[in-house]
Amino acid sequence: MGDTCLFCQHQASEANKQPEIKRSGEEPLPQDYTRVIADKVAGQSKVAVRAEGDVIIERNQEVLNADWADYDQTSDTVRAGDRFTLYQDGSTVSGDTLVYNLKDNTGSSEYVRVDAEKDGRRLQSVSEKAEMKGKGLYKLINTKFNTCSPGDASWFIKAKSIETDQETGIGVAKDASLVFGGVPVLYTPWADFPLNGHRKSGLLVPTLSTGSDGLELALPYYFNLAPNLDATFRPGIISSRGVQLGGQVRYLEPKFNGVIDGDWMPHDKKRHENNRYQIKFDHNHQLTDKLSGGINFNQVSDDNYYRDFYGREDIASNVNLNRQLWLNYGDNIWGGSFDGALNVQKYQTLANQNGYKDEPYAIMPRLTGRWQKTIGKANINVFSQFTRFVHDSKQDGSRTVLYPSVRWDFNNQWGYIRPKIGVHATYYDLGSFGSQSSRRVSRVLPIFNVDTGMTFERNANVFGKAYLQTLEPRLFYNYIPTKSQNDLPNFDTSENSFSYNQLFRENLYVGNDRINSANSLTAAAQTRFLNPNNGAELFRAGIGQKFYFKNDNVLLDGSVGRYERSQSDWVGFAHGKLSDSIHAGFDIHYNQNESRAESYAATVRYNPEPGKVLSARYKYGRNERIYLQSDGNYFYDKIRQIDLAAQWPIRKNLYAVARYNYEIQAKKPLEILVGAEYKSDCGCWSASLVGQRYVTGENSRKNAVFFNLQLKDLSNLGNNPFEKLRLAIPGYSKTNEVVTP
């Protein structure tokens, strides 16, 4: 098979390559006829012959090469030596001596090598004895096998016996050990495995990691229940907490699909709590050609679940766990397109470490409809929505929105003009709450805006390179009369962050409870650098500002305030490639009245080739939301963060990975990640060792160490950190997919 050395050389593959098959080159024979060719052939036809010197025996799809062969034609049996090679439908058997029946494909050989390839998966083995029990059926005695390149035995399965069936694609090993670098690392008395990469029920390789909670071990078992149905059972243990049981079921039908996933810990020794769990259910269903629906349900046992069992990104993104039932409908009606939706949604909101939470309203239900039709240059749009809002500790109510509008599109080669006019009508039916009695209120506002832009092009030369450069000035006028909205509730509305795209929105708010007043003009311009050959965008930069013709402004609480000046702050950006290997980006929100930046972020990434990336990012915000306080309001403060990340080869096939995310204002690291990855020269295995320390709350941190050993076409040992590295390091590449010279 080759050396057990972990650091395979390509020369070893050449020296141990699969034996080549010599064919006669003559016309194919009829079915079940046998051809014998050699330097010397003697014997009696139709009885027995002996062939010596470069023997070639062909029958059906099989070819046998040998130094000599005795062929008994009465029984269709061949004895061959001193060396032989037998080719059978993608498999090659080679060794010293062979006894083989050409008719029923049975026989045996000692000190034999078997090479097979099917559906892109390669297997190689060396055995004391091989028994051929029919077409595609083998039994290997005292054998070693792996899926590596010829000559690479950096890892292999050593077994007392292995039986393989090429037809079913299943192999069964008995008394088997996984040997890595010459050292046995796993043992099983019995195991079955797929030969062709197809799914099959059986034990999966254990996952292993360590960290603040001690050693974490899981022993998953996979159930291939049907071609469209499978399940995984994940029993495991966390040393400082206890036993954890998990599982997943996946199903797929032509009209629907879904995933059910869950974990359960009967008793958490560290928290001194019982029955800690999580449930995830996602179902999508195409009911008819026009009607689809689905369910998304998430639940955990307690507020600390994600902080205890997940990483920093999951903690931040799982504060409001979604529970939603939805139906979508689409059709052509009255010569236009209609889209409708019905939603029922309620969140499980998790409290922060101080026990505070800001729970959104439940939607019980929401019915939305939108009809659009184009007549000439006019696009007619009618939006309608009814929502019933329910909350345990706030005023309930329903909201009905009707927003018909018409937009005209006038386009030509130099630019466009798009005027739009509409009427936004909102009606509320509010229930009684505390000392407040039930009431009905409404708001009707006309909306008018004009969006216009131009595009100029020129050939440009920058640092000796030719580009097609555009200059794209844009004006956006928006008018909405001022109307106090402090008598209206705020069910689901928030303010958009101020950005370049925000300059061209008619409403500063997300949601229908607040509509800003407007009599403003946005003036902006952007430039793009394009590849003159294919038009691909390489770089884009822009800057813009809004000018107010009236100072009235509707605030988030519904009251009418006033802008302090007649123009907004500046916003600008620049993103793109500075060269083939350097990508940079910059975004800024600048207050020219105070001569200060309200926020900005600068990013640069050097990525000359896969597996080589260095990135740096600096982020500043003068008044950013930090955390929820006991009074239900958020605490705002300045943030200054630096984020450094890298993946880089430090020697051939050995890569270092790292990330350092530091909050300068709070004087504490948010995340530290450091590790190393290695892939073998012949590509048969790769390994990762990654350590991570990250923030889980205002005053809490967690540590984790992940080790992963990936064996080609077999499985992963340990806990694969790929997803964590992909999120932590912009431009990260899987080490085992990096091609090195």
Can you describe what each PLM-predicted range is?
Residues M1-N142, F156-D175, F233:
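N-terminal amphipathic/hydrophobic interface segments
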Residues S91-N146, P150-S161, D165-P741:
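Outer-membrane beta-barrel proteins and related beta-barrel translocases across Gram-negative bacteria
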